Amino acid sequence: MLNLQAVNHFYGNQHSLWNVDLVLRPGECIGVLGREGMGKTTLVNCIAGHLPVASGRMTWHDIGAPPQDLTPLSAQSRSAIGIGYVPQDKRIFSQLSVEENLHIALAAGKPGANASGGEIYEHFPELYALRQRKGASLSDDDQYQLALARALI
C-alpha cells in the first residue's frame, strides 16, 4: 500500500504540491486529473523518487511487512521494491532490441531475474514475438507495452 500524508514540494520558492494525501491499496488503480501545470507529473516524480519532498510522509507497506518510509530512498531503491511509472515519452532505447531493453531494466532492478527466461514474457506475450525488433520499429502500442514491462521489472 502506498500512503502519502501532507506531502509538499517546491520548485524554488514556488509551492507545487500542497499537503497531498493519497492512499493506494493493492490492486487499486487511480487516475490523477488536472490541467497543465497543476502538479500531476510532480506528484508522480516525488512518489518515484525523482524529486524530493519538502515535507510530509510517504510510506510503502508491502503485504506481510511493516510500513517503510520512502523519503530517504533513491529512485532505484524505490524501483527495487516495486514503485515505478511509465512516462508519457516512454523512454525506451530505440536502437536496442526489445530483449536488450528488458535486460537493461533487469540489470537495474531485481538481482537474479532473467528476461530471456520468460518471466516478463508471461505477462507480455506480445513482446516475446517482438524480442529481436528494435524499439524504434515498434508501434506506439508495442512501445508502451515495452515501457510498462520495463517499469514492472
Regions found by a protein language model. Give the residues of each.
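Conserved ABC nucleotide-binding domain
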Residues: 70-72, 120-139
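ABC ATPase C-loop
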Residues: 151-152
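ABC ATPase NBD Q-loop/coupling interface
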Residues: 57-80
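Conserved structural motif at the start of ABC-family nucleotide-binding domains
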Residues: 2, 17-19
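Short beta-strand immediately N-terminal to the Walker A/P-loop
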Residues: 30-31, 85
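The feature captures the beta-strand-to-loop junction immediately N-terminal to the Walker
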Residues: 33-35
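ABC-type ATPase nucleotide-binding domains, specifically the catalytic core motifs of the NBD
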Residues: 12, 52, 75, 98-115, ...
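Helix-to-loop junction immediately C-terminal to a conserved catalytic motif
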Residues: 48
